[in-house]
Each structure stands twice: as structure tokens, then as C-alpha cells.
């Protein structure tokens, strides 16, 4: 596990450790507020887009780097490497777009 992934994981875990106790110790009266669920839906939609964009860009970057490394080692195989790389990039991008659609539907559940 690289240092960058360890730092990313510790940032996510640290954020969860800070936010979870505050939600667990919330008052009972605040749970009946109708705007509370709507605000968490908006936060969830924002996190969905952010995490999907982060994962998609990391996946696309690694796929492109591996394909370019393969082409640089064997330039004759460029045609055989390029087509699966483009297909893989399209599938990665479709997952990001799917998360965008889900976030859009979550925004539609928020009552004004």
C-alpha cells in the first residue's frame, strides 16, 4: 500500500470518526425535523459525485499510464492496446455518469 493511499484512507477514516459520534449523540427532537433528512440527502448526493469523480479519474489515469507504458515498450502492439484501453476508459466513465444520475435522483427527492 503506497503512502498516498494510506494518507487517503486515514483521511476518510478520520473524517468518519469525527462525524459519527456527533450523529450518534444527537438529540431525539432533532430527528423529527423534516429538513434534517433533506440536508443529508444533499450531502449524500455531493459525496456521490465527488467520490465517483475521484475514483474515475484515478482509474482512467492508471489505465492510460499502463497502456502508454505497454505501447512504449512495444510500439508494434499499439493498435492492439489502444482499442481495449478506449473500451476500458469508456466503461470507467460510464460508472462516473451512473453516479451522476443517482445523485441527480437523490436531489429530486429533496422537498423544497
From Swiss-Prot:
Gene3D superfamilies: F1F0 ATP synthase subunit C. GO terms for molecular function: lipid binding; proton-transporting ATP synthase activity, rotational mechanism. The record marks 93 as: Reversibly protonated during proton transport. It is found in: Cell inner membrane. The chain crosses the membrane at residues 39-59, 86-106. It is a multi-pass membrane protein. Its main location: membrane. Keywords: ATP synthesis, Cell inner membrane, Cell membrane, CF(0), Hydrogen ion transport, Ion transport, Lipid-binding, Membrane, Transmembrane, Transmembrane helix, Transport. One of its GO terms (cellular component) is proton-transporting ATP synthase complex. F-type ATPases have 2 components, F(1) - the catalytic core - and F(0) - the membrane proton channel. F(1) has five subunits: alpha(3), beta(3), gamma(1), delta(1), epsilon(1). F(0) has three main subunits: a(1), b(2) and c(10-14). The alpha and beta chains form an alternating ring which encloses part of the gamma chain. F(1) is attached to F(0) by a central stalk formed by the gamma and epsilon chains, while a peripheral stalk is formed by the delta and b chains. Belongs to the ATPase C chain family. F(1)F(0) ATP synthase produces ATP from ADP in the presence of a proton or sodium gradient. F-type ATPases consist of two structural domains, F(1) containing the extramembraneous catalytic core and F(0) containing the membrane proton channel, linked together by a central stalk and a peripheral stalk. During catalysis, ATP synthesis in the catalytic domain of F(1) is coupled via a rotary mechanism of the central stalk subunits to proton translocation. This is ATP synthase subunit c. The lineage of its organism: Bacteria, Pseudomonadati, Myxococcota, Polyangia, Polyangiales.
